[in-house]
């Protein structure tokens, strides 16, 4: 019989030959696996089927069949003779077919080996837009009447490989306006009508295509006259250098026959173009010879002037005040004023203090004596500076700057000073400039300095730092009519004039008038490698039109960068088409490492920047928009911004970041001014309204636990040639070197290992096939894959939970064992099916937090083709040999964020791995390196406490949220102004939020309640982890994202506006007192029964539900056809385990065995914090039976011989011996300390039944 299992087969016949013409309704070209499953789910009837292209084998197909609400997938592979066959199990004869139609016809009959016969073909959903609705609906791309276009006829060869030549410029006519790309109108008519006539002619044996020939001749008719003009001009130029040249062009023009047929016209045009090519080459050779002859008799040229050195950074001074406590202020009398002078070139910081008698007192600190900068998050213009006074002693001074911008400028100058005088051969951090501009098909003005220097509106750089050159400049333009070479020269000349540096062009890629250019400092040219360019068309049939994207990627030493510049579909109502443009670009743009072809470009690069004219508009009345803009109130407008809305629905730019927008909409201005928006346009079809919008955007996505900060994001206000304003963004990006181990290559004795204890994934699919995982990383010699999963279950027809134990997972061996190398590495995972070898989801995990002697938990999200498809969690560790534990401080770890300065003078500053400036919605602050050497941490592990319990893990800090420092309960306080050493755990996870005894960030604060149970001391030092999400700026609600350093402070998934939140576990529902029949929330047990128990501590009230239908359906097939499928996968997957495992309670943290405590974000399955290795045993008895077996312990003695008998004997006495293994494993092996156990500890040990928890706690209470 036909089988769904097998290895990938060879490529073969393409779909065109296999299908025949026209394509049948059941064939879906470019349909994703997830979309196919949703179409079949909507059909809902057994035997529904469709055929799509295979995602794993080029030229192959996938037959998807629905049977009993499950989707079964069969691969259809071509053989060497282009015959097609369904992949079968071993031993089953193979049936071969010439076309897919024949294959489907056979398998439509019963008993042919499939799970059922093919009965009901499923057609693809029709697009809402009519087929003749072209991509120029709002007139955005029309050429302006003023200023006129340049009359230059020079054609510059493109720099990037694969770029099309620039088309010769033609006069603007009404016909050209209706067809911006020159072919769209005529070609569209051919595709609608004449295409079928040519097809019939070919079937009749014709060897030519008369209608296509006529179409091409008509389209190129104007090109004839243009070529004639160019040839005539070149003939005159040729005679300047060669008087004897023959008038060949004149004869050629005279030979033209005005009554030529379409085919003769094309032949004549090809001949002219060939002559034109020879003429251009000949003129260059003749001119070179003549000029060489002239130069041989000319006087010698004067010597070239010496190359100017780059401009030096002048000494900058900052006026500050010393921030002192109230007590110090009374002693001093008034606050002290200082002047901080930064000498970048000299590597010095001078503190100048003016005293009352006009005398000056100054202190000079060299760059190596400035130990740390600590930004205050509460006071935006406050900065703490830690100086080295003498050996091993530091002093912290807090300064108040004039403004937050001055503080940022001071920090940037000090970082530049550190970088200049660093002893490292390779940089740890570079500065990247991103610029995007729709030029409106007119040449740029002579002066675009404001764009290059990030001056204008929004978040801009301080004037002190605008002249500091960036390491990399990336310019993305749309509707750029300037030739590639001319544009590149213009950019280099502008940068040369601004910085005195001759920037090197790394790549230039063009598609029509969409261009991206990358230039780097000369000193970095040899650090760039693996340059790749690509382009994608997104017009009609992804072929015609003027929309699309261009991209560039490269390696900067050991860090991969990707840059995508796009121009998406225009029109207020074209949101869905813009979304599809984005998904097409994500899937089809070919950039980066070819070995990572299983991953889309959002996961192939350490840092991916996506920018351009995205064309998303504002959904608001024009007058309201104008009123808000006039009042500079952008918050209401950002709430109706289409890009923000689509991102909140997880439809586009999944877990990308964008800096907060604080500048006015960049489109559509009156040309020549920035005071008026040209929103009213008269068109032949009527009046067109182009509302002011933020069409031009810059977004980015970075791997978890990497460093990236957006220092500016705004637009210019003095470049007025286009109806768009140029936008800019500057970024501070951490980079890694091409690591060379001082110890040499790893030997067997000192090999590092990446070991997995278990992995569990929840995958969005209606299939019930088996899965395996592939592991990719630059630290591995080759990719590795696991065995198929050994367990799987499903409580929801559209989701499948699959699990791998350590036996099914490989042990990975990195090529280098040094910790300094491994802490910069990442692991890419893809979950693939055994039936079709197609990916069901991909993710990235940082190794940095996994390094250690004990296993660490990771939790992140799966995505495929830009869609969220599930989540994955696991337990793993990276073992590093002791002799390879040496590491060093990174430059970007020099600045940290102090979120809570309350009592800062009486306690140590919060030395976190960085956090965020609240002014920057998605800024990633610099982490601060722990001063304790890593080798010391491994050599001197913490001693366990004498209680017999496992030691509580040390406090961890997160880049997104440093821990709130707690007052020390014992020990001497820290000396005033002296920074305390960081905690003894150097491998915290900055990609996840670390919470210590604080409520969930997204839940409303609770009023104090005297009845609330205090936080148990046993969990005092536990570290809770939740998964962050990149916020869309302060104006947008946060969402859960993968463990990415680009994420904001968020602890859960919020549903999109048009969907109600997922149902919380029953235990999280709080009824009003009048409706709650019994005290305490309802708790659902493993057997599905309900029991009542006391409300758990730290419970949070359920947030109010937005209006909308109740989310009762868990089967996607039951969703109405109008469902926009935007609800988060994790919200829908949440109900998977509510029956199997009792939830820990709302807002509660479920402790994992080991050093980390996993707090399940909202929207994840309720058992997400359950221990991976020690699940609680299944409780089959009913609650009543359990209660009948319970026996109270006598008063006056220990429960069940507590203290005399062992743990097992006590548990057997009360009938709960099943929990002995879990309790012992979690450290509760000593009955003397069992009285300290809490409800959370019981849940951690696997006691999920509320009646059993109550029995254990009551018994222990009686024994006290």
UniProtKB/Swiss-Prot annotation:
Location of motif NPXY motif in this chain is: 989-992
According to the entry, every stretch annotated as the SAM domain falls at 1210-1264
Q: Where is this motif: SH3-binding?
A: 950-955
Q: Name one GO biological process term.
A: post-embryonic development
Biased composition (Basic and acidic residues) is annotated at 124-137, 957-971
| Annotated control of activity | Activated upon translocation to the sites of synthesis of PtdIns(3,4,5)P3 in the membrane. Enzymatic activity is enhanced in the presence of phosphatidylserine.
Instruction: Write down the EC number.
Output: 3.1.3.86
Q: What InterPro entries does the database record attribute to this sequence?
A: Endo/exonu/phosph_ase_sf, IPPc, SAM, SAM/pointed_sf, SH2, SH2_dom_sf
Q: Where in the cell is it found?
A: Cytoplasm, Cytosol; Membrane; Cell projection, Filopodium; Cell projection, Lamellipodium
The record's catalysed reaction(s) read: a 1,2-diacyl-sn-glycero-3-phospho-(1D-myo-inositol-3,4,5-trisphosphate) + H2O = a 1,2-diacyl-sn-glycero-3-phospho-(1D-myo-inositol-3,4-bisphosphate) + phosphate; 1,2-dioctanoyl-sn-glycero-3-phospho-(1D-myo-inositol-3,4,5-trisphosphate) + H2O = 1,2-dioctanoyl-sn-glycero-3-phospho-(1D-myo-inositol-3,4-bisphosphate) + phosphate; 1,2-dihexadecanoyl-sn-glycero-3-phospho-(1D-myo-inositol-3,4,5-trisphosphate) + H2O = 1,2-dihexadecanoyl-sn-glycero-3-phospho-(1D-myo-inositol-3,4-bisphosphate) + phosphate
What GO molecular-function term can you cite, just one? Answer: actin binding
What residue spans carry the Pro residues bias annotation? Answer: 944-954, 1002-1017, 1054-1065, 1093-1110
**In the record, which positions carry Phosphoserine?**
137, 246, 358, 896, 1137, 1263
Question: Could you tell me which cysteines form disulfide bridges?
Answer: none
Which residue windows does the record flag with biased composition (Low complexity)? 169-180
Superkingdom of source: Eukaryota
Q: Which family does it belong to?
A: Belongs to the inositol 1,4,5-trisphosphate 5-phosphatase family.
What is this protein's function? Phosphatidylinositol (PtdIns) phosphatase that specifically hydrolyzes the 5-phosphate of phosphatidylinositol-3,4,5-trisphosphate (PtdIns(3,4,5)P3) to produce PtdIns(3,4)P2, thereby negatively regulating the PI3K (phosphoinositide 3-kinase) pathways. Required for correct mitotic spindle orientation and therefore progression of mitosis. Plays a central role in regulation of PI3K-dependent insulin signaling, although the precise molecular mechanisms and signaling pathways remain unclear.
Instruction: Kindly give the PANTHER family that the UniProt entry links to this protein.
Output: PHOSPHATIDYLINOSITOL 3,4,5-TRISPHOSPHATE 5-PHOSPHATASE 2, SH2 DOMAIN-CONTAINING PROTEIN
Q: How does it assemble?
A: Interacts with tyrosine phosphorylated form of SHC1. Interacts with EGFR. Upon stimulation by the EGF signaling pathway, it forms a complex with SHC1 and EGFR. Interacts with cytoskeletal protein SORBS3/vinexin, promoting its localization to the periphery of cells. Forms a complex with filamin (FLNA or FLNB), actin, GPIb (GP1BA or GP1BB) that regulates cortical and submembraneous actin. Interacts with c-Met/MET, when c-Met/MET is phosphorylated on 'Tyr-1356'. Interacts with p130Cas/BCAR1. Interacts with CENTD3/ARAP3 via its SAM domain. Interacts with c-Cbl/CBL and CAP/SORBS1.
The UniProt comment on domains reads:
The SH2 domain interacts with tyrosine phosphorylated forms of proteins such as SHC1 or FCGR2A. It also mediates the interaction with p130Cas/BCAR1.
| Protein's name according to its UniProt entry | Phosphatidylinositol 3,4,5-trisphosphate 5-phosphatase 2
- Species of the source: Canis lupus familiaris (Dog)
């Amino acid at each position: 019989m036909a089988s769904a299992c097998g290895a990938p087969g060879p490529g073969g016949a393409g779909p065109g030959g296999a299908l025949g013409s026209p394509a049948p309704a059941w064939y879906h070209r470019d349909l994703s696996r997830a979309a196919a499953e949703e179409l079949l789910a909507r059909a809902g009837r057994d035997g529904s089927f469709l055929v799509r292209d295979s995602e794993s084998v080029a030229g192959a197909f996938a037959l998807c069949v629905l049977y009993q609400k499950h989707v079964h997938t069969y691969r259809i592979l071509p053989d060497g003779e282009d015959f097609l066959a369904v992949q079968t199990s071993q031993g089953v004869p193979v049936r071969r077919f010439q076309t897919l139609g024949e294959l489907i016809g056979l398998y439509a009959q019963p008993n042919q080996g499939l799970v059922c016969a093919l009965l009901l073909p499923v057609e693809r959903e029709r697009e809402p837009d009519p087929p003749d609705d072209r991509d120029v609906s709002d007139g955005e791309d029309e050429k302006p009447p003023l200023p006129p276009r340049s009359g230059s006829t020079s054609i510059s060869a493109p720099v990037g490989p694969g770029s099309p030549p620039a088309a010769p410029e033609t006069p603007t006519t009404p016909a050209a306006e209706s067809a911006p790309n020159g072919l769209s109108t005529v070609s569209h008519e051919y595709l609608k009508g004449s295409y079928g006539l040519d097809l019939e002619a070919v079937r009749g044996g014709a060897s030519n295509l008369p209608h296509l020939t006529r179409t091409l001749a008509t389209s190129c008719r104007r090109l004839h006259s243009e070529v004639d003009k160019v040839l005539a001009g070149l003939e005159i130029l040729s005679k300047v250098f060669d008087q004897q040249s023959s008038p060949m062009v004149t004869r050629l023009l005279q030979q033209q026959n005005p009554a030529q047929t379409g085919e003769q016209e094309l032949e004549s045009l090809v001949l002219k173009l060939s002559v034109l090519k020879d003429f251009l080459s000949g003129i260059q050779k003749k001119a070179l010879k003549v000029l060489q002859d002239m130069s041989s008799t000319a006087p010698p040229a004067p010597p070239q002037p010496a190359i100017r050195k780059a401009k030096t950074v002048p000494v900058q001074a900052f006026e500050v005040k010393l921030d002192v406590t109230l007590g110090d202020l009374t002693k001093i009398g008034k606050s002290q004023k200082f002047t901080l002078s930064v000498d970048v070139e000299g590597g010095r910081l001078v503190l100048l203090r003016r005293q009352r008698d006009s005398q000056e007192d100054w202190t000079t600190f060299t760059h190596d004596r400035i130990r740390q900068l600590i930004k205050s998050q509460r006071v935006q213009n406050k900065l703490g500076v830690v100086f080295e006074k003498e050996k091993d002693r530091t002093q912290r001074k807090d300064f108040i700057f004039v403004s937050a911008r001055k503080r940022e400028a001071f920090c940037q100058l000090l970082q530049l000073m550190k970088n200049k005088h660093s002893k490292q051969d390779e940089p740890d951090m570079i500065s990247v400039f991103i610029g995007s501009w729709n030029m409106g098909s007119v040449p740029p003005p002579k002066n675009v300095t404001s764009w290059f220097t990030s001056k204008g509106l929004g978040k801009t750089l301080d004037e002190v730092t605008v002249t500091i050159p960036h390491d990399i400049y990336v310019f993305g333009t749309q509707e750029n009519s300037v030739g590639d070479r001319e544009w590149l020269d213009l950019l280099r000349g502008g940068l040369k004039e601004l910085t005195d540096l001759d920037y090197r062009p790394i790549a230039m890629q063009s598609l029509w008038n969409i261009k991206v250019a990358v230039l780097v400092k000369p000193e970095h040219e040899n650090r760039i490698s693996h340059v790749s360019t690509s382009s994608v068309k997104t017009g009609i049939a992804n072929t015609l039109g003027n929309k699309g994207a261009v991209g560039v990627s490269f390696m900067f030493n050991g860090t991969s960068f990707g840059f995508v510049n796009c121009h998406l579909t225009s029109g207020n109502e074209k949101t869905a088409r813009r979304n599809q443009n984005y998904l097409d670009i994500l899937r089809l743009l070919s950039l980066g490492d070819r070995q990572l072809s299983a991953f889309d470009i959002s996961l192939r690069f350490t840092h991916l920047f996506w920018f351009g004219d995205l064309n998303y508009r504002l959904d608001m009345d024009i007058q309201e928009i104008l009123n808000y803009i006039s009042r500079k109130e952008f918050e209401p407008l950002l709430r109706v911004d289409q890009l923000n809305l689509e991102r909140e629905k997880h439809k586009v730019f999944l877990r990308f970041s964008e800096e907060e927008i604080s500048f006015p909409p960049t489109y559509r201005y009156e040309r020549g001014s920035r005071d008026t928006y040209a929103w009213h346009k008269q068109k032949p079809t009527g009046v067109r309204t182009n509302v002011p919008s933020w069409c031009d955007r810059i977004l980015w996505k970075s791997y978890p636990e990497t460093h990236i900060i957006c220092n500016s994001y705004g637009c210019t206000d003095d470049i007025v040639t286009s109806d768009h304003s140029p936008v800019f963004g500057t970024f501070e990006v951490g980079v890694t070197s091409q690591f060379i181990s001082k110890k040499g290559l790893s030997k067997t004795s000192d090999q590092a290992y990446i070991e997995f204890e278990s992995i569990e994934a929840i995958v969005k699919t209606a299939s019930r096939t088996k899965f395996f995982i592939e592991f990719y990383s630059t630290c591995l010699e080759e990719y590795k894959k696991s065995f198929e999963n050994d367990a799987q279950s499903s409580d929801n027809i559209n989701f499948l939970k699959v699990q791998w134990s350590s036996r099914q997972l490989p042990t990975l061996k990195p090529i280098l064992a040094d910790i300094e190398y491994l802490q910069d590495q990442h692991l890419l995972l893809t979950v693939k099916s055994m039936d079709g070898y197609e990916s069901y989801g991909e993710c990235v995990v940082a190794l940095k937090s996994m390094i250690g002697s004990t296993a660490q938990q990771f939790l992140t999200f799966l995505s495929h083709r830009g869609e969220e498809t599930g989540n994955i969690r696991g337990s793993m560790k990276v073992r590093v040999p002791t002799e390879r534990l040496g590491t060093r401080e990174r430059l970007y770890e020099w600045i940290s964020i102090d979120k809570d300065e309350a009592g800062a003078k009486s306690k140590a500053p919060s030395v976190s791995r960085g956090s965020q400036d609240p002014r920057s919605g998605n800024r990633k602050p610099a982490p601060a390196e722990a001063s304790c050497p890593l080798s010391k941490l491994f050599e001197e592990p913490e001693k366990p406490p004498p209680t017999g319990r496992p030691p509580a893990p040390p406090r961890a800090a997160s880049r997104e949220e440093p821990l709130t420092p707690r007052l020390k309960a014992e020990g001497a306080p820290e000396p005033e102004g002296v920074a305390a050493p960081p905690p003894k755990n150097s491998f915290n996870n900055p990609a996840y939020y670390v919470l210590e005894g604080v409520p969930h960030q997204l839940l409303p604060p609770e009023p104090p309640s005297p009845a609330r149970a205090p936080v148990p001391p046993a969990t005092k030092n536990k570290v809770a982890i939740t998964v962050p999400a990149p916020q869309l700026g302060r104006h947008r609600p946060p969402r859960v994202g993968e463990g990415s350093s680009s994420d904001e402070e968020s602890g859960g998934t919020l549903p999109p506006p048009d969907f109600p939140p997922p149902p919380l576990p029953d235990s999280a529902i709080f009824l009003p007192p009048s409706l709650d029949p019994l005290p305490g929330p309802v708790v659902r047990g493993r057997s599905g029964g309900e029991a009542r128990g006391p409300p758990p501590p730290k419970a949070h009230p359920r947030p109010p539900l937005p209006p909308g239908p109740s989310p009762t359906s868990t089967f996607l097939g039951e969703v109405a056809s109008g469902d926009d499928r935007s609800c988060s996968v994790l919200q829908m997957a949440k109900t998977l385990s509510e029956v199997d495992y009792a939830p820990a309670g709302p807002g509660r943290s479920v402790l994992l065995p080991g050093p980390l405590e996993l707090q399940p974000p909202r929207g994840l399955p309720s058992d997400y914090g359950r221990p991976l290795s020690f699940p609680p045993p299944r409780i089959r008895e009913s609650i009543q039976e359990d209660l009948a077996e319970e026996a109270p312990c006598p008063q006056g003695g220990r429960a069940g011989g507590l203290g005399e008998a062992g743990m097992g004997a006590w548990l057997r006495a009360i009938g709960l011996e099943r929990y002995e293994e879990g309790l012992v494993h979690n450290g509760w092996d000593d009955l003397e300390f069992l009285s300290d156990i809490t409800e959370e500890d019981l849940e951690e040990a696997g006691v999920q039944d509320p009646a059993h928890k109550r029995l254990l706690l009551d018994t222990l209470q009686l024994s006290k």
